[in-house]
Amino acid sequence: MCIRDRLYYELRKAKGMTLEGAHKQVHNPLYLGCLLIKNGDADGQVSGALSTTGDVLRAAFQIIKPKKGISVVSGAFLMLLPEGSPYGTDGMMVFADCAVVPNPTAPELAQIAVSAAETAKVLGGFDPRVAILSFSTKGSAKHEMVDKVIEATKIAKEMAPELALDGELQADAAIVPSVGKSKAPQSDIAGTANVLVFPSLEVGNITYKLVQRLSGAQAVGPILQGLAKPVNDLSRGCSWEDIYKTVIITCNQSIIANQK
């Protein structure tokens, strides 16, 4: 039995993993890659072109695990908007969560927002201005889904009081200055957001794909946020450019993590 078989067995034996099962699982490239990272033989992994997001995440959760103090791993996209777009910062925005958490609770949504801001700052190189989105702007609608966003906004501000963040905001109020001024005149974020946090995975996944296909924006990711080591997923509809850019993102994540 090789070192990697033994390592995976030790990680999963409490869950009923056998030595024979570990040997078989390690032949799966998703698990082998994560074990190489865990053992210090690799710095990051890019996968998903031929695998489902669920399979990629399962291997990462079992072997890499979340960062210390982090309970929510989420997925963000760095959106590279068409030249001349009036939105975002230098043609860039971050969308989250578009890949991992189906229906986040208010505390989970708050953590996704804070993680997305970090992604914008570290990988996008711009100062994040975070909007937590809803179908309501500042009380324009009453619903339990709106209440969740309001609570998430409150928690996120407590988690990161220095962060430029607001909610609940409708999408147009978040990114269009005139609409933001009209609908949320007291908000410092309305009309100028460059990080959009969606209330559910359903909304986030649909939105990033529509923006990508209808506007010609490039969607780099999903960038997995909150893992102890860089593991990133690709859409099975990805192009070679998507793979190339995600590899660069993963390398940057590794370099930055090693500098801390």
At which residue positions do the language-model features occur?
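Anion-binding alpha/beta catalytic cores of soluble intermediary-metabolism enzymes, centered on
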Residues: R4-A190, V195-K260
